[in-house]
Every structure is written in structure tokens, then in C-alpha cells.
Amino acid sequence: MTHPSAPRARSNGKEPEKEEPRCVHPDLTPLNVKDLDNKSSSAITNENVSSPTLLPFTERLSAIQPQIPNLLALKEPENGKNKHPDSEQDDGDMKEQRSKNLSPESDDPLLDHRHLQPGDTVSLLSHKATLQMYRDNAKKTNDPMLSYELAVFMLDVSRSLEFSQQMLSRGQDPAAESEQLAKEAMSILRRLADRGHVESQYLAGDCCMNGYGMSKGRPDLGLAYSYFVQAGKRGHPDAAYRAGTCYEKGWGCRRDPAKAVQFYKMAASRKHPGAQYRLGTAELNGELGLKRLAREGVKWLKRSAENATPEFPHALHELALLHEKGIYNVLFVDNEYSCELLAQAVEMGYAPSAYKLGVNYEYGRMGCPQDSGLSIHMYNIAAQQNHKEACFALTSWYLVGVPGILPQSDTEAYLWAKRAAEQGLAKAEYACGYFCENGIGTPRDLGEAKGWYQRAVEHGDNRASSRLNTLSGYTAKPVGIAADEASAKNLPQAIPVQPLSAPFPSAAPISTMRTLGVANYPTPKTMKETQAMQRDLHQQALVAAIEEREKPKTATPTSPQGPSFFGQKGSQGRPSEKPFSPSQPPKEGGKPMSLIAAGPRAGFPKPPTPPPPPPPEPEPDADAQLAANPKSFKSRLLRLGKMGKIRKGAASEGAEGEDAENVAGLEVPEGEEPLSATEKVPDGNEAPKSAPNADADKETGLNKDPAGVGEGAPSPKPETGAMVLSGPKPLGQARGQPPALTPGPSGPSSAAGADGAPRLPGEPKQHTLGDSSKPEAADKMSQEATEKSKDVNNEKSKNKKSEKSGGLSFFGLGKKIMNKGSDKPGSEDKKNQEVPKPSDEASPSIAKPTDTPAPLSPRPDEKNSSLVERSKDSESTSPSSPKPTTGSAEPSVPPMPAMPPSTVVRPSPSMALVPGRLPAIGAPDRTESNPVPASPQIGGIVPSRPPPPGVRPVMPGTMMTSRPFPPGARPGMPPNAQPGARPGMPPNAQPGARPGMPPNAQPGLRPGMPPNVQPGARPGMPPNVQPGARPGMPPNAQPGARPGMPPNAQPGLRPGMPPNAQPGLRPGMPPNVQPGARPGMPPNVQPGARPGMPPNAQPDTLSGLPLNVNAPEANNMLQLHPSAASGVRPPAALQPSLRPGPRPFSPTFPSPAGPSRPNPHLLPGVSSSSDGATPRANGHGVKPGSPPSMPEQHSFAPPAMQPGRPPSPSSPFGRPPTGPFSPSAVRMPRMPSQSSMHQSGNGPSPPKPGQMMNVSLPARTNQPHLGGASPRPPRPTSPPPFLTSQQPNRPPVPRGVMPPGSGPSMRPPQPPAIIPPPPRSPPARVNQPSLGPPGSSMPQGRMDMPSGPTAQGQSPLSKAMVSPPKMSSPDRPPFAPPTHVTPPKTPAKASGFSTPDSSSSKIMEFKDAESDNLNFGSATTTENAAAVGEDKSVRKKWLGFL
């Protein structure tokens, strides 16, 4: 490698010294000198270089990479780089190619100064020399890019002169020189902008906007706006964005949001992130005249985030905030993606995003881990950009410090708070005032503190006002930016401190790691060592505390439910009421050892210490208790086999020494203490001293013990897991057999294990901790003690019958409370004491204990000794005391009545209870708040008293909280009820039965059903009916049959059809008719023919009247169409009116005036299909003046209930009307209003000339001209003639009238003169009982004919005169619907039944079934009428019961 200072070889007679300044100049060091030297050395090897001066310059141009991409930064072509300098032609080609890239006026490569660009390469030459070179080039050439480059360089120099005053001053004013350079650059830019140079226009507009290079430094917004608009229209994205900003803010122009949006979209289309962000926020907030569209706004924000730059990272931050909360149906919540967007913005240096991430890392939000180091780092990035919230956050961190990351410094905390307060943060101003008032991080200055408090009050901090009151006597000093500027040289500068050992790259220079606080900070190494020592000491303290707590424990785990559940010695380590947690490490030498042994240094904060937990409870010293009373403790544990009595006596004698007689069960004279000091129960559980009577026994044995639960507890409620002692030993248990496991309130316990642990039969006995004697010695001592106590116990058993002393025993084994209150368990105490029971009659089966049961007492170190003390108030029954007495301290309290045997739980075969003998239930005393616990799994009883008010009775062997019934039973049930039964059910009811059902009812039945009914049947059905049958069907009907069908009918048939009919036929058709025929047609008619046609007629032929009209058809036609020659005229109100209505109507729904007000202009017809209704119930009308009833489902009314259709005589709807006239559809001439109505499209097509018009009444309204909305399809018509019987008083039918069931196409054209015009009369209301003459049997028109079932032998109108209609009667028929002028479209159906081709057949059946109408939209047969009435009465009966 050739050194740059080495001399060069001669070339073309030129000295190499002339080239030395170009190659050895010290300012060339930033360039790649290695590449230059290598290339120049390669050129030196060739002596035939024609132009040596071009080679270093050419290679240099190819090596320099421009810093700012613009049009001046043109790279050399590839052929120019790789040309070898040997040939002259190659060098000429290179010069020619380079001249093309330069200005056309100059071919001299020396004039190309593209390597002299503003930025880092400016230092290659001095400013003065570089400016001179640029000026020379600009004068010699007219290239706009070179002039633009000169202007840019001048602006950069003018700005950098402020920071290099000492370098360029030399007697000149740098400010004046800078202003002169700026003005010169601005003149060049304006000249280029006028010539149309886009870059110059934008840069000139920016200078005018900032006032740079302008006269007096004032901005010219109008000139800037014009330059921005010109450049923006030429496609400059930044200029378009700035032009949109001018239009939005009104800078240099009038505000025009539409123009602003136009320029923003122009810039956004060229991927300008600022314009895209502004459009996104405008769409989200509905600004700039745009609609508020969140989806479009999010789209613009996403595009801006994709094109984000360090100058415009705002979209990343906003999009992250949107993902944090989400936008409904637009943007979902994604915390992880939100943090990722924030991190991208932080990489671009966006301060708000850095602060947001700092908060997340400090508090662990948005899925970020809680990291102090990262939080401080993010706060530092934001604080370097003077983010006020981040500066104040650093104040908080400096106040507490982070070991190993950030040292604690009050000075740094004050400086950062001051920086935040200078930017107007109210809480930072208050903090600065507090620091100055108390001298934290700064000298105490109350005047300055008052000044900060005043600024905080001005910015809305209410806490500063109270502080100002305390500083009323001081003068506030000026604080803030003004005071800092005045004394900027005297105040220290806030230098951010780089966190120590931070898990992130350094964001501050190394020189800024020095702090301004106390100089005696601990080093990171010292801090780590101190923290390690603290952790070790704390760990050692915890380990020592755990070992101390687990000393009395063994390897056997302790049960949380009981002291002796897991095995031997488990009760010794029974956990106390409060868990043990040491508040400090063990003491050494009587002084507590501090956790921070090293101690904090000056400036090092103490670590925050947790609040001290409550002091631990002292653990009972089992060894001391066993040493003080080892024999007595062991005697209460060894109780197995026939030697239990001897062992107990020997242990009692060895336990007390001189008091052995008292312990063995001897009488103690009054005034003597039966127990020694060492015999007392620990933890304050003392045995009662004396109990001369029941009252004294209650005071000493029950109320005196204050520590039933724990130490110092006032309530005698037993602790969880306490041992439970209960009544006598069950039958069948040998004396040597261990008692069964007895679960206490929290778990089972045993009476036969050492240390209270359960021991199964046959398990060897265990020795407990502290046993100083062997079993052999214990047996020997027991024998001696037993021999001494035999006579005394036998004498005492004779006098004990009259004494009242209560106590609990474990199968008859346990301590006895003597009349003096001594704790003396005797071998024959079971014979000498009476056990109070409810009554002998109530519990005759209580098992009597054996002759010599071994006593049982709990361990003295257990805290549940209060249970034993309280259990002494009741004693199990002995053979010598057959008469029971109550164990209550108050003899006046009666015992609780005995519960039935079903309430006694028998979980094991060891429980033996005679069926007639039951345990008593009650509480130990009315004055106690907690009962005596007992075991529910022992066969004995717990003598007790009735429970106090508000307390549940106690089951034997259970806590007070347990229920006095078996586990499967519920409260409020009898004792002998089964577990699955519910309250309110008889005891012998089955578990699956429901309340309110008889005991012998089957489980699947429902209330209100007879016991012998099948489970699948429904309420209201006879017992012998099949499960699949429905209500109203005979019992022998098949499951698939429908109501109203005979029992032997096939399942596929429909109601109203004979049993032998074919399944495909429809109702009302004879059995021998063909399946394709329609109802109402003779059997031999063709399938395609329609009703009313002769059998030999063609299906589509329009003929006159049928030729073979038989008597039934004539009767049916006579019923619906009376002749004028009969002499019988209908009432005036029922005569049709030829006056048309004011407007066509379509009464689909009832009018608002009422559901049953027909239009008086028209008569009811057979083709009614609207939802009008007549207020009929049970076959009677409405009283005069009564309001109309509420309409029911009128569209589902059966055809037999339509106006103008009488019911069949065989149907249960009632007898046929007795009147001679039945109003029906009459043939009327076609009126103009009718034709206009049909043409309007609201009704069906008009009938052909000569056909009959069926006119029916609509719903009655106050306005006769108003009708419904749209017509409904016509309803099925009356039954065919062959299913209706001959009715009297029927005039012959005229030949000109068609049956109502015939379709419109089958009606033969008849001259209108055949039907005589009815007399004109004023229209009157129908559906009123007053229309007919009083006392007459003629109904008020067929519209009001009853269509529901009536009582047999009762006229349809007989009941209507005395009772109003019922709104919810079960047998109320649907109202007869009003009709409109519609020719019938469906043929007549037999018996009025709905057919499959009717749209409402299924709905009609469903509706009738819901309204308890057993007719299912039709008239039932005569043979089923009685069954229907009977079934309805049965249902009424059951409904009344429910």
C-alpha cells in the first residue's frame, strides 16, 4: 500500500508535488483512502498514461457515494469505470460520456463538483473555498441543478455557523455572515422557482414559511402557500402535503377543507405518510367535511404505517392505540400487535410511543412483562425529546432507584421534575414546589417552592392551594423558563443517567453516565453483593422458621380435616388456627438480627420491607406436657382389650402419686382440689371445679370454658377437626374390640389409637412421644390402681342414680364429671351415672353398654379439650338407671320429641339401634351460641336439650350446622321420607313423584292425574287411556287416531270419516267414493267433476242446476238460500242492502272499533274468510250494551262456525235453529262499486254475469266504510247434504239458487230476475240480542248462530239472555269471522271439517286444542258428544284443583 505522502512518478512532464495537496490533504481522511491509493498505484504502474490528472479524479468520483439522493448524485456509467487508461480512445470516450452527464455548456471535468455535497463531506474543504468553487460553477453554467445545489449548501453553511463561531469568526460577526448567506441562497431559490424548478419551489416555500432568508426573519405565509401549491401541482408529494396543510389551517389563504382534502389525497396517492395519516384521522373523527367512517380511516392509517418514516411515525402510534381498545366490527383488540407497533415507532424515535411502552413495562400492561430496566430505557428515550410525562416518570424512578440498574438520586429526581414542570405539567410543578419546600435534591427555598405552587394552581392542581396557605408569609420567586434563561450558566444541567447493567443497547453517550447527585454512591458490584447477602439472610431466616415450626411434627402429613385422620401422631402437628409466618429471623443473643446486615450506605436507599405479619402463635410443647403427666396421658390412649380397666387404673395411680385415689374415681371431699397443677388442660382449658347441682354444673362445665376454639376464644365452638365423643357403645361390640371410626365435624376419629390416631381392629398399639414407661409397667400399675378403686366405685354406684351430671362419652368410655368437678375417670362410671334421654318410649332400642367399658379422654395437649369439658354434662345410659332424665341444666325445658328411625344415618354395620328407639335432638343450652358436636355415625344418643330459638335441632353426632335429616332429604320433609323425595310430599311417596301427587302415583305422572294412569298420558285423560292418545279421545282409541274419531278407526283417517273409509279419502265423502273425487259429490261421479254437477257432466262444463238433486241437497240449499215464494221474510236488519259501501274493504283483521261489528250494508255469506268474530260463548249471545269481546284466532275458526252455516244436528254444537229463515249469501246484481272494488285488486275477481254474489258481513266498526287490510282465503263451507239430517221448516229451494259450497266456475249463469230484490230498510246492527222479537225462537241472523257446544236440550239463545259472554271460556268457540264480497273458491266439505288443501287446517286443530275446544274445527259425531262433555267436565275439575 502506498502512503498518501509518498512522491508520485512523473507523468507528462508534470511534477507530482502539484498533485500532493489533492491526495495528501488532511481533510481527505474521511474518504476511503485505501481504495484511492490502490487505484492510483495501479495507474502508476503504467508509464503510458496520457492524462494522469484525470485518473485520480475519475477513480475518486467512482468511489464517493453521495449522502443525499438527488439529481446531482449521478453515478459514473459502467463503461467509464472499467475503462483502462492505456488507450487515448478510451479516455476520450470517458470524457465524452462524462460531458453528457454534466451541463452542455462545459466539457471541463474540473467544473464538476458533485463530490462537494452538503453533509459529512463538507469538511473536505473549507467553507470559503467550497463556496467559491460553487459560485464559479454557477456563473459559468446555467444548469438549474448546480444552482440548486449551491443554494442548499449556502443554507447549510448559514445554519452551521452558529455552532462554529470560533472557527470562522476571525473578526467577523458570524450572525451577520449567516444572514447574508441565507439571503443569497433564498435569491437563488426564488430565481430557480420562477423558472419552474420543482425542488426549488418547495425549498423556497419552506424558507418562506419559517422566515429563513426573509427580511427581518419574518415568515411570509402567502408566498410559501403559492410555492407549495405550484410544486404540489407538479407532483411533489411534500409540497402537496404542505399545500393541504395551508388550506386546512388557513395559512396564506382562505380555509377550504375540500381543497385540503384534495391536496392530501394528491400527496397520499404518492405514498406520503403524513398525508395518509391526516386523511385517516379525518375519516375517524369526521373532520375536513368527511363522513365519519372508521373503516376508511383505519385503511388510511394502515397505509401510513406501512410508509412510516422518522419524520412521520404518527400512524404507528395511533394504530397501536386503536388496537389496544378496538373498534366494533372494524378493528379487533390485539395487545401484542399494539406493542409491536409501538416498538416500531420507538425505533423511529417517536416520544409518545416510547412513553407508552415505558408505562407498559413499568406496570406489566398489554401483555408486556414487568421490567424496570426496559421501563427506564423507554422513559429515557422519550425524556430526551422533552416529553413531559416521561421526564416526570424518570423523577419517580430516581426517587426510589432500582438496584443494579438505576441508583437512587434525589438530585436527578428534582432535575427531571423541573424539566417536566418547565413544560407546564401541573403535577411536576407541585413536585418541584414540594422538593424546594422540604429540601429534596435541592437546597430548601420556600420562596421558590411558593412560586412552583402558584404555577401548579394556575394549571389546575388543587393540592398546591393548601400548600400555599402554609407559605403565606413568604414571597414567591419567579420560576420556570424565564428564570432559567436568566441564570442558565449558574444552574446545573439535567444530564440523563444511563442505567447500569441495562438489558438494552446504550441510548446515551458514555459521557452522560455520570450523575450529578451524591458522589458516594455504591458501585454496582457493591449493590449486587449487598442484595445477595440480603437474600441469603432472608432465606436462612425462613428455613430456620420452618424447621422450628415443624419440630413437633413427624413425617406423617397432617390432615386439614382432623387431628387423627392420616395416622399415628398426626394430632401433634395439627395446624393452629392461624398459619405460622415468621416476622423476623431467629434472635441471636437476645437481639433481633436485621435482614440488611451490611446496612445501607449514604445515598443508597433501603429496600422496601413488607408489612410485618401478626406474631406467630406459640406451639404447644408436647415433651413438657408428656414429662409432666406421662402416665395419665398414656392411660387415656391404651384402652383396648380386657385389660383396659387395669391399665387405666395403673396409669392414673402413676400419674398423680398422692392423688391417685382421686384420679381412680374416688369421691373427693368438698373444698379439696381434685387435680394437681400439672393435670390442667393446656391453653386455658380448665376442668370445672365443682358441680353440686345441675345449675352449677352448667356454669362450671359449659359456660366457664372460654377457649373452645383457640387461645383466648370466647366461644365454645369446637375447632375444625376436633375429637367427638358420643353416647353408649353399640350392641354387638366386644369389650376388647376398638370402637368404630367416628367422623367429627370435619372428619372421622377413633377412640382406640395412640395419640388419638385411628386404629383398625387388630392393629398393634403405638407409643407416643414422651412415653417414659413401657407397656408392661403400665399394665402392672393399672392392676394396682384398679384393686384400690373397686370398693369405692361399687359404693358410689348406689348413690349416683339421683345425681344429675351430664357428659359426653365415646361409646360409653370417657371422663366423668363428679359432683365436685373433679376429672376422675372410673372403671364403673357407666353403671353409676344416668344418661338423659328424651323418653324410653321414644327410644326403646338404645343399646346398653357392657359391664366394664374402658374410659376414653382426649389428649391434654389438644386445643379441643373444651369439647371434653362440655361433654361432661351428659352421660350415656347405664343398666342401673333405666329411667331417663334430661341432661339440661334447666329441668323445666322439655326434651325434643324423638325423630322417626329414618333420620338416623347408618353408615356402618357397627351401628345398632332398635327400630323403636331414637336419639334425641337438641342443643346443650339455650344460652349458648354454639352446640356440642357429636358424631352422626355412632349408635348411641347425645342427651341434650331443645335447641334455642333460631337454631336448628342437632342430629346425634353432628355439629349444629348439620341438618336434622338424612343426607338425601331436604328441609321441611318428614323424618321417614325417602332421600329423593321433595318437600310437601307424603313420606311414602316415591322419589320420582312430584309434590301434590298421591303416594301411590307413578314417578312419571304429573300433578292432577289419577294414580293409576299411565306415565305417558296427559292430564285430564282417563286412567286406561293409552299413552299416545290425546285428550278427548276414547280410551280404546289407537295412539295415532285424532280426537273425534271412532275407536276402531284407522290411524291414517281423518276426523269425521267412517271407520271403513279409505285412508286417502277426505272427510265428508262416502266410503265407496273414489279417492280423486271431491266432497259433496255422489259416488259415481267422475273424479274431475265439481260439486253441483250431474254425474254424467264433464268436469269443466258450466251447466245449470244439477239434475239429480236429492232431498238432503235440497234441504241444504233451502237452508242457505230461502225462496221468495215461501212467504217468510227475514228481519229488516238482516235483509241485504243494495247500496254499496263507500269504499271496497278487505276485513282481514278486526277493526279498531271492535272485533264483532259487521258492516250493516252487507249480509253474511258462506264464503266468509276474514277475522271478524261474534261475541258468542257457550251458544249464547251478548247482552245489550255489553262491550264486544276480545277476538280470538278468527282465521282458524272452523267452517261450521261461519255465519250463515247452521250446525249439523248430529254435532254437539246444539240443536238446529227453529226459525224458518237462515240468512245466507243471496244472489245480488253486480253493483258499480263492487266492480270497482274488484278492479282495485283488494278483493277476488268479480263473478261472471248471471252468477251469484256471496255477500257477507265484515267486522263491525264505528265507521262502516272502513275494512281490513287484505282478504283471507275463503273458509270451508257447510257440510254436504248426505251428512246432515232433514230439518223441519225448510222451504223448498228455488232452481235459480246455487248451493253455497259450489265454486264460482260451476255456477250456471242465471238471470238476475230469479232472485227477488229484498225490501229496502235502514241498515241495523246485527249481533245484538235486541234485533229479534222478545221471546221468539228465531235467532238474530246466522251471523250470530252459536257454533260451540251447548247443553243438551238448551236453546242456543236461552243462555244468552241471562249471562254475558266469558272471555276465556274453555268451550267458547272462535268468533264467526266477517266476510267480504268473495265468491267461494273451495268446494263444500263434509261436516265442515278442514281439509288438507285448506291453508289453516293444521293451525285450526292446534288452536282448538289450545282453547280446549274438542271439536277441532268441526262438528263431532253424536256418539262422541257425551264423551266430550264428560271429558270437559273432568278437565274443568282438574283445572279447578290446580
Curated annotation (Swiss-Prot):
<keyword id="KW-0472">Membrane</keyword>
<keyword id="KW-0449">Lipoprotein</keyword>
<feature type="compositionally biased region" description="Basic and acidic residues">
    <location>
        <begin position="762"/>
        <end position="804"/>
    </location>
</feature>
<feature type="repeat" description="Sel1-like 3">
    <location>
        <begin position="273"/>
        <end position="309"/>
    </location>
</feature>
<feature type="compositionally biased region" description="Pro residues">
    <location>
        <begin position="605"/>
        <end position="617"/>
    </location>
</feature>
<comment type="similarity">
    <text>Belongs to the SKT5 family.</text>
</comment>
<feature type="repeat" description="Sel1-like 2">
    <location>
        <begin position="237"/>
        <end position="272"/>
    </location>
</feature>
<comment type="function">
    <text>Activator of the chitin synthase CHS3 which polymerizes chitin, a structural polymer of the fungal cell wall.</text>
</comment>
<keyword id="KW-1003">Cell membrane</keyword>
<feature type="compositionally biased region" description="Pro residues">
    <location>
        <begin position="1306"/>
        <end position="1322"/>
    </location>
</feature>
<protein>
    <recommendedName>
        <fullName>Chitin synthase regulator SKT5</fullName>
    </recommendedName>
</protein>
<feature type="compositionally biased region" description="Basic residues">
    <location>
        <begin position="633"/>
        <end position="648"/>
    </location>
</feature>
<feature type="compositionally biased region" description="Pro residues">
    <location>
        <begin position="1371"/>
        <end position="1386"/>
    </location>
</feature>
<feature type="region of interest" description="Disordered">
    <location>
        <begin position="72"/>
        <end position="117"/>
    </location>
</feature>
<keyword id="KW-0677">Repeat</keyword>
<feature type="compositionally biased region" description="Basic and acidic residues">
    <location>
        <begin position="859"/>
        <end position="875"/>
    </location>
</feature>
<feature type="repeat" description="Sel1-like 1">
    <location>
        <begin position="198"/>
        <end position="236"/>
    </location>
</feature>
<feature type="compositionally biased region" description="Low complexity">
    <location>
        <begin position="747"/>
        <end position="758"/>
    </location>
</feature>
<feature type="compositionally biased region" description="Polar residues">
    <location>
        <begin position="39"/>
        <end position="53"/>
    </location>
</feature>
<feature type="compositionally biased region" description="Low complexity">
    <location>
        <begin position="876"/>
        <end position="891"/>
    </location>
</feature>
<dbReference type="Pfam" id="PF08238">
    <property type="entry name" value="Sel1"/>
</dbReference>
<feature type="compositionally biased region" description="Basic and acidic residues">
    <location>
        <begin position="12"/>
        <end position="25"/>
    </location>
</feature>
<feature type="region of interest" description="Disordered">
    <location>
        <begin position="1"/>
        <end position="54"/>
    </location>
</feature>
<feature type="compositionally biased region" description="Pro residues">
    <location>
        <begin position="964"/>
        <end position="977"/>
    </location>
</feature>
<feature type="region of interest" description="Disordered">
    <location>
        <begin position="550"/>
        <end position="1402"/>
    </location>
</feature>
<feature type="repeat" description="Sel1-like 5">
    <location>
        <begin position="351"/>
        <end position="387"/>
    </location>
</feature>
<dbReference type="GO" id="GO:0005886">
    <property type="term" value="C:plasma membrane"/>
</dbReference>
<feature type="compositionally biased region" description="Basic and acidic residues">
    <location>
        <begin position="75"/>
        <end position="99"/>
    </location>
</feature>
<dbReference type="InterPro" id="IPR006597">
    <property type="entry name" value="Sel1-like"/>
</dbReference>
<feature type="compositionally biased region" description="Low complexity">
    <location>
        <begin position="1295"/>
        <end position="1305"/>
    </location>
</feature>
<feature type="repeat" description="Sel1-like 6">
    <location>
        <begin position="388"/>
        <end position="425"/>
    </location>
</feature>
<feature type="compositionally biased region" description="Polar residues">
    <location>
        <begin position="1392"/>
        <end position="1402"/>
    </location>
</feature>
<dbReference type="InterPro" id="IPR051726">
    <property type="entry name" value="Chitin_Synth_Reg"/>
</dbReference>
<feature type="compositionally biased region" description="Pro residues">
    <location>
        <begin position="1200"/>
        <end position="1220"/>
    </location>
</feature>
<feature type="repeat" description="Sel1-like 7">
    <location>
        <begin position="426"/>
        <end position="461"/>
    </location>
</feature>
<feature type="compositionally biased region" description="Basic and acidic residues">
    <location>
        <begin position="821"/>
        <end position="840"/>
    </location>
</feature>
<feature type="compositionally biased region" description="Polar residues">
    <location>
        <begin position="1232"/>
        <end position="1243"/>
    </location>
</feature>
<feature type="compositionally biased region" description="Pro residues">
    <location>
        <begin position="1139"/>
        <end position="1158"/>
    </location>
</feature>
<feature type="compositionally biased region" description="Pro residues">
    <location>
        <begin position="1271"/>
        <end position="1282"/>
    </location>
</feature>
<feature type="repeat" description="Sel1-like 4">
    <location>
        <begin position="313"/>
        <end position="350"/>
    </location>
</feature>
<dbReference type="InterPro" id="IPR011990">
    <property type="entry name" value="TPR-like_helical_dom_sf"/>
</dbReference>
